[in-house]
Amino acid sequence: MARIIECVPNCSEGRNKEVIEYIADAVRSVPGVALMDYSSDENHNRSVFTIVGDPDQMAEAAFRFAKACVEKIDMTKHHGEHPRMGAVDVIPFTPVKDVPMEECIEISKKVGQRIWEELGMPVTLYEESATAPHRRNLAAIRKGQFEAMPEKLKDPQWYPDYGNHEIHPTAGIVAVGARFPLVAFNINLSTSDVEIANKIAKTIRESSGGMRWVKSIGVMLEERNTAQVSINMTNYTKTPIYRVYETVRFEAARYGVHIIGSELIGIVPMDALVETAEYYLKLENFDKDNQVMEKHLL
């Protein structure tokens, strides 16, 4: 039986197609892994890649991804709506099939150490790989973004796990870790007022007293003149997609706006979508393990 893990690295480039393809080709050069998907957002100026494959080869694929980002992306010239602190901003590893979380943690440490030793980019371990409770949350690590990192890394609480207390001059710093599958979900509103998106994001995110397992910010999509609630769901089994969507819809109505569209970034676990379909279709006596064709084929 094949053993499979997933890696979903994010890079701080969403506009230059040549650079994005250069990074994609770096992943494709590694045998034993598959680049399943990659998507870019010009407003966020960010790309998300989904790689799956053999655990032994995934460490090499993640490193080559990071190396390509360091070679091609200059954070001193980067501007975008999405928070970021590095050229390769985050590298998460997720167990998929017959791989324990502990193995993903070890892979994350191996990759983090190599990024520092060979690329000179400091690394902070996060989520399940974190070395202290306050370092689990990516948003806390990234707070202040690239511009504030030189000062932040002088604080002993935020010393990198690999590297010294200085950021890479053009590549910044990267978070590497192991985690549960994440659902990246964006909801677009019928308004150009980004403050409304900010208020809704604050209401729904866990850090402000909202829903557990939800991280959210408001962003402005300049090209579409549309405000967006950008959401990361860190445990879709505890806080499902439909609940987040309905809460945003309810909160938007307070401001006289409605949802005009939504998008999923990257690959999403099948169960997350099946659960959403079950809710909206009001299915009775539905058995997802026996009534979903793909469950019998996988």
Region roles according to the model:
Residues 1-298:
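Long, contiguous binding/interaction regions
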